[in-house]
Design a protein with these regions (language model features):
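Protein-protein interaction/assembly regions in multi-subunit complexes
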Residues: 1-366
Length: 366
């Protein structure tokens, strides 16, 4: 069975759906999480972040909404660049400006079609602006920024920067990224209870789900699952490559290896700047291959425990704990680092194969 199949697109909701088969649940959840938090996209900083101030300068505003609300609303405006433009984008290369004064005798709407912009100090054409700030397909309206009464004036300038949803939700490329288990109708027919029917999904011999429906609603009309899924797999691969590099470094500042509570044959890896996404993928792969399937490392070494923990939800810190048996020196960290590094390499190979299958599927179907 193909890993990806049955792509559909619902235009009113902009929802892309497709089925995923026989891919580890942790990898699918990792793709979902990375799409939501780790894909860099251009946008406007509409509120103070940890390392950034708002990228909006209010020149004149004597309307009903005060500056903080206007800046926040501007920060939520999607910047719809194309895939190659997103990848190559450098901070502040696009500058936008809006200057509207109500000289009529009635209240007017100020919308994104009033915005002008420059790219590298060259004016962006009106047609391109309509693509960057598109109207709603159903209502044909542009995004409402504010309303001005007679004599009121709004003038602002803003810089477009590239950040991720981890920095702020306004840099989230999607409004929806989730998955569900596909029900097995033969098993569901055997159940009388509605909840039992919902639990009757396709499973492997361990009871894990193996068929999924993945849904993505993209905010930017120029990018969709073809770009987002590929990008998320690249990011996960890069995270694993970076971890491998740190494991090989004797002077690593991001990975600390130490024996866990003086328990012989158990070491923990304290990893900075990582979270559940990577931890769950590594844990799931090692558990499936060494504990469930009882495979050996270097033909004789058994893994008896693999687990991870992120001690605090607001701190990017992950701890992986591994127990190995039949090691020549259970107090040496080298064999544990080698074990984790080799498994990272195997996961990278698997993710690369998945990406190739996804690319072929996307070319033919999306």
């Amino acid at each position: 069975m193909l890993k990806f199949q049955n792509y559909t697109y619902d235009e009113p909701s902009t929802c892309h759906s497709f089925e995923i088969n026989n891919i580890d649940l942790a990898i699918i959840n990792g793709i979902r999480r990375v799409i939501l938090t780790d894909i860099p996209i251009p946008g406007i900083i509409g509120e103070k972040l940890d390392n950034d101030d708002p990228s909006v300068d209010i020149v004149i505003n004597n309307g009903a909404l005060h500056n903080e609300i206007i800046i926040h609303r501007i920060g939520l405006i999607p910047i719809c660049l194309k895939e190659d433009e997103i990848d190559d984008y450098e901070d502040n290369s696009i500058l936008i400006e809006l200057n509207v004064k109500n000289t009529t005798n009635k209240t007017i709407d100020v919308r994104t079609n009033h915005i002008t912009a420059t790219r590298n100090f060259v004016n962006i054409s009106e047609d391109e602006l309509k693509d960057i700030f598109p109207a709603n397909k159903i209502s044909k309206d542009y995004i409402l920024i504010t309303r001005l009464r007679t004599g009121e004036h709004l003038h602002f300038k803003a810089k477009i920067v590239k950040r991720t949803g981890r920095d702020n939700a306004s840099f989230n490329p999607v409004s929806l990224s989730n998955f569900s288990y596909i029900q097995d109708p033969k098993e569901a027919d055997k159940k009388q209870n509605i909840l039992d029917k919902e639990r009757s999904y396709y499973k492997n011999k361990y009871g894990d789900p193996v068929r999924f429906k993945f849904d993505i609603e993209s905010i930017n009309h120029n990018i969709g699952p073809k770009y987002l899924v590929s990008k998320s797999l690249d990011i996960i691969i890069n995270k694993l490559e970076a971890l491998k590099k740190e494991l090989n470094s004797e002077r690593s500042t991001k990975v600390k290896i130490q024996q866990f509570q003086d328990i012989e044959g158990t070491f923990e890896f304290i990893i900075e700047d990582e979270d559940d996404t990577l931890g769950n993928i590594i844990q799931s792969y090692i558990h499936s291959n060494y504990i469930r399937e009882n495979n050996k490392f270097k033909d004789k070494i058994s893994c008896t425990y693999i687990g991870y923990i992120c001690p605090h939800p607001l701190k990017s810190l992950m701890i992986i704990r591994i127990s190995l048996e039949n090691v020549s020196d259970p107090t040496s960290s080298k064999i544990f680092a080698s074990f984790l590094e080799e498994n990272c390499s195997i996961i990278i190979e698997e993710l690369s194969k998945i990406k190739n299958e996804w690319t072929n599927f996307a070319i033919e179907n999306i």
